[in-house]
Amino acid sequence: MPTQPSRDLQTFPNPKPGRPFEIAMECPEFTCVCPMTGQPDFATIRLRYVPAERCVELKSLKLYLWSFRNEGTFHEAVTNRICDDLVAALAPRWIEVVGDFAVRGGIHTVVTARHGERPAGV
């Protein structure tokens, strides 16, 4: 398993693919760089998803999120990129990615990206 930032999201088989259930994760140490100012942006990334056949492996998720720390990107772009990359890796029944960014210039930004239909009762 790598120990450096990587865009390679590893997955493993869902242990209960016949039962819809939600997985929730919070990553409070996300960083990227503002493409306008070059200053660091800090965020908490919250993931919630209902897996189909695959689940994301946590260390690979940590290294994936770490890979953005020196990248210039807008809050809206990176939140949607994370959602798109997780959809490509997992093909979940439903996923929600929330980027809750620290205040910059007196403005608190929260970006939410979703994919799929959330199963009833989950």
UniProtKB/Swiss-Prot annotation:
Keywords: Cytoplasm, NADP, Oxidoreductase, Queuosine biosynthesis
Pathway where this protein functions: tRNA modification; tRNA-queuosine biosynthesis
UniProt-annotated binding residues for substrate: 56-58, 75-76
Keyword Cell membrane: no
Active site location: 34, 41
Pfam families per the UniProt record, alphabetical: QueF (PF14489)
Biological process, per Gene Ontology: queuosine biosynthetic process; tRNA modification
Family the entry assigns: Belongs to the GTP cyclohydrolase I family. QueF type 1 subfamily.
EC number(s) given by UniProt: 1.7.1.13
One GO cellular component, as annotated: cytoplasm
UniProt-annotated location(s): Cytoplasm
Enzyme class: oxidoreductase
Main location: cytoplasm
InterPro entries tied to this protein: GTP-CH-I_C/QueF (IPR043133), NADPH_dep_7-cyano-7-deazaG_red (IPR050084), QueF (IPR029500), QueF_type1 (IPR016856)
GO MF assignments: preQ1 synthase activity
Catalyzed chemical reaction(s): 7-aminomethyl-7-carbaguanine + 2 NADP(+) = 7-cyano-7-deazaguanine + 2 NADPH + 3 H(+)
Gene3D superfamilies: 3.30.1130.10
Signal sequence range: none
UniProt protein name: NADPH-dependent 7-cyano-7-deazaguanine reductase
Protein's organism: Anaeromyxobacter sp. (strain K)
